[in-house]
Amino acid sequence: LMKSFIAARELPEGLGVVDVPLLASSPSYGNLDEFDYDNFSEVLPEAWYDDPEIGKKACTTIPLINGKNVETGPRARMEKFNGFKDKGVVAQHVARAEEMLNNYNLTIDLLEQIDTSAPARADYDDRGTGKLGIGVIEGPRGTNVHMATVKDSKIQFYSAIVPTTWNIPTMGPATEGFHHEFGADVIRAYDPCLSCATHVMVVDDEDKSILKNDMVRI
């Protein structure tokens, strides 16, 4: 059904296919053990993009694992934990739909296990030790990583690497080789949240006039 619905867009074959490592810690919730913190790094966008001027306009850092950008989200989870093999824009939507069904069934099972008499808040010491704490959880758009240090009940350091941040450096290569009119389809497929905050600008190669400058719509 999902493939039939997307077929109406008449997307070119191979749109959005990108060959990068996957980032997925769990099929549904989150698993810190699956996050390779020792090989995690961030670089400034000026150092990542071929044109430093483009990097200066970016609003996020570029997170990397083993020095490479990654793919995170429903398709990455479905491939890593469920054997899903298709790639590209259509595959992103199909994987998202299949994952929603899986999570619906999981939610029903979890609701049946709820103990309404159990404590609603975990017992922990909020004074902190000054050591780095890392939390990893899977959101609808991908892996969410939060890092913090707390000492004497005060936050000393906090950083969030959200799915959009992981997805940004991967969506660029996923659009290469296709007409600019399909750029919005790639953005929507990889990161529906980002599509509401993205401009598509088309510049004439000869006279550098701006042919298009529109917001991407969800």
Annotate the PLM regions.
Residues L1-R141, K151, T164-I218:
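Active-site bordering "gate/hinge" segments
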Residues N144-V162:
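Short beta-strand elements
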